[in-house]
Amino acid sequence: RTRFWANRLQGPALAITFDPPPHQVLHPGSERPPLTTLEERAAWLEQAGVDHLIVLQTTRELLSWEAEEFFQRVLVQQLRAKALVEGRDFRFGRQRRGDVILLEQWCCQAGCHFEVVPPVLHEGMPISSSRVRQAVEQGQVELARWLLGRPYSVAGQVVVGARRGQSLGFPTANLDGIRTLLPANGVYAVRVSQDRCHRSKTTAGLPQPGTFAATANPDKAESNNRPPPFPRLGAAHIGPNPTFGEHQRKLEVHLLDFQGDLYGQVLRVEFLARLRDTRRFHSPEELQEQLRRDIEAVRQWREPPGESW
């Protein structure tokens, strides 16, 4: 609907986000991994037809503004908005006093079109970031895919690991520098691709906005190796490795039918289905047999109707 109004009024389609999230400013120490990075958010919005993403630096001063002050200073004076599209449960301003009823009144006074879009439902309940987060935290990646309309994914850089997978005949790529929420511990069928830099039209801050090019991962990949054909199916393990007495939680991925060097490359891992829980095996041979079964399960995975590579 934002794209509709932009076309109708012959202006750019803008989206506004806050960075960092307001709850981190109001409640220091409450940080938790986000579902997406700011750069990923910019890329998804750009794909959806948004021309510019306005990033407001979240400060206590900004959060102290009353709702009408925010409306006047940001939407009217700074952005000169001609149309505004919001969800019915949107709240803003000090102590979340602003709502869509007030927005409609103020937009009418300012000569700004206003539209409230209905929520998108799944099984009779509105889709929200809280539902997505809960699904990911519980390892319900199939549910997360339905809620998002795409597989949930994370990105990280391939680093040197213990190389136990290679000794077992199943080499894995160990991913580091992941900035978003990892699903629950377990083994998953995944789809892996090379994470390319997204160039998104993003405006940071007010009242003096600037533009930056958003990338999916700030770490510079130092590998000059030729990337493998992507996308490629794989089996991913999240969690410690109890069979070898390891306690560190990590993400490692075995790419099906691939041999090569991925060190330094930034990979994106899409979670397609959960295969099983993490468990301790009595011997490396028992682990090998289970890995064979996991890989066969990945080969048997079929894309849900309506989705395509």
Which role does the model predict for each range below?
Residues L14, H52-L56, K82-E86:
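Divalent metal-dependent hydrolysis catalytic cores, especially in the metallo-beta-lactamase
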Residues E61-P171, T278-R292:
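Classical nucleotidyltransferase
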Residues L45-Q47:
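ATP-dependent adenylation/nucleotidyltransferase module used to activate substrates
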Residues A162-W309:
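Phosphate/ribose-recognition catalytic cores of enzymes acting on nucleotide-derived substrates
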Residues R1-T37, A43:
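N-terminal catalytic cores of NTP/NDP-binding nucleotidyl/phosphoryl-transfer enzymes
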Residues R3, N7, G149, L291-E296:
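Solvent-exposed alpha-helix faces
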